[in-house]
């Protein structure tokens, strides 16, 4: 309803909510490789949680997993993106102070 009011063609919109970061990036890769779409938006990079982190125990250290996941995915996607001319937008967020919200 809201997207439609903004002019989004709902019938052409593909929405996916994957369980893991790997799944999400694989979906993006498949869509981009198909050449059938013009734009892919990943919102948000911070929500792309690596499988190892989801399947691990609370408190386990997973240093750099997300950074490695994104680095590998972007290396893989960049070639495909240049061939298909698909636009890929990755949305992220910046956190300057842990525990501080709303500009305080």
From Swiss-Prot:
It is found in: Cytoplasm. Gene3D superfamilies: P-loop containing nucleotide triphosphate hydrolases (3.40.50.300). InterPro entries: DNA_recomb/repair_RecA, P-loop_NTPase, RecA-like_N, RecA_ATP-bd. One of its GO terms (cellular component) is cytosol. GO terms for molecular function: ATP binding; ATP-dependent DNA damage sensor activity; single-stranded DNA binding. Pfam families: RecA. Keywords: ATP-binding, Cytoplasm, DNA damage, DNA recombination, DNA repair, DNA-binding, Nucleotide-binding, SOS response. GO terms for biological process: DNA recombination; DNA repair; SOS response. PROSITE patterns: RECA_2. PANTHER family: MITOCHONDRIAL DNA REPAIR PROTEIN RECA HOMOLOG-RELATED (PTHR45900:SF1), RECA (PTHR45900). Belongs to the RecA family. Can catalyze the hydrolysis of ATP in the presence of single-stranded DNA, the ATP-dependent uptake of single-stranded DNA by duplex DNA, and the ATP-dependent hybridization of homologous single-stranded DNAs. It interacts with LexA causing its activation and leading to its autocatalytic cleavage. This is Protein RecA.
């Amino acid at each position: 309803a809201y997207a439609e009011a903004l002019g989004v063609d709902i019938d052409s919109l593909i929405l996916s909510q994957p369980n893991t970061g790997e799944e999400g990036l694989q979906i993006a890769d498949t869509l981009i490789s198909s050449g059938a779409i013009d734009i892919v938006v990943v919102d948000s990079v911070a929500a792309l949680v690596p499988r190892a982190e989801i399947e691990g125990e609370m408190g386990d250290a997973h240093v750099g997993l997300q950074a490695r996941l994104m680095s590998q995915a972007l290396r893989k996607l960049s070639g495909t993106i240049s061939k298909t001319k698909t636009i890929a937008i990755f949305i992220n967020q910046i956190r300057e102070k842990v525990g501080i919200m709303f500009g305080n």
